Amino acid sequence: MLNNKGFDFWAGDYDKTVGISDEENTYPFAGYKKVLWFIFQTIMRAGNAVVLDIGFGTGTLTTKLYERGCSIYGQDFSSRMIALASEKMPNAQLYQGDFSKGLVEPLRNFRYDYIVATYSLHHLTDAQKSNFLLDLRNYLKENGKIIIGDVAFETRKDLEECKLKAGAVSYTHLTLPTN
């Protein structure tokens, strides 16, 4: 997995890379637009929802929700991704933090109609996912929902086999800046 510096480096081309993977129906973003559209429609049925996005990246989903009146909160560990998303959503409450360590303090002070995680939770181990999702329940409003749109497999071995079969692109070859 890329660290925050890797995602900072990738941020400028992230949307393009994801779009190509989705269009070519390749791992890991095959079906990306369909997943986001389903989540968008689900949230919009509730009207002006309060939404927390975990690992929001460049804000592809949350920008659409923001433009339609939702209150957006988010946590991402890439400062560059946050900067790009903030340009699109100047009044959103976006914070930097590694969600494998839980929510950052400011986000713990709110309750949400929806907590979404799209293409982010697969970076956690199964145990981390379980603990994190259990903790997130504490931040939902009554009748609130957690919606996950992500790459999912029954076992880690199944995931690795899928990557091999798909000829998945490895981003470990990126040359990162030294500063």
Placement of each model-derived feature along the sequence:
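Conserved small/polar residues in nucleotide/adenosyl-binding loops
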Residues: 172-178
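A short glycine-rich, Lys/Arg-flanked "PGG" loop and its adjoining helix->strand segment in the class I
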Residues: 130-142
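Conserved class I S-adenosyl-L-methionine
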Residues: 1-46, 147-169
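A conserved beta-strand element that flanks and buttresses the S-adenosyl-L-methionine
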Residues: 116
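Class I SAM-dependent methyltransferase SAM/SAH-binding core
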Residues: 52, 58-103
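Short amphipathic alpha-helix with an adjacent loop that forms part of the alpha/beta core around
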Residues: 102-110
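Short catalytic micro-motifs in class I SAM-dependent methyltransferases
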Residues: 119-120
